[in-house]
């Protein structure tokens, strides 16, 4: 197995990304943005079921995941993806900018949250290199 690493002030940065969002337009924009920042977008998925299948196929080391998905919400999907793809860095996103409590982030195994409208200006390498969130 080959690990793709990008240097950062953290020891590991996810570089092979799965995008999960029910909006095809957002997935396309996010894929373009991630590619411009040096990430490899492996696959895109529109819901939790597609995301789990994509994880089984491509084993991403990072996942950009919408909180508001049809069917299971993004928090439940994040927990399922973390169990299916141990070690993947999960970054939650949403058009809703409300703060996600650390306890919720820890429970669903996400490492960060970024509002969709802030994605273009976010330091994605730092977001995808964060260690798991502690509720302490």
Describe the role of every protein-language-model region.
Residues 92-93:
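Hydrophobic/aromatic residues positioned on beta-strands within the core alpha/beta folds
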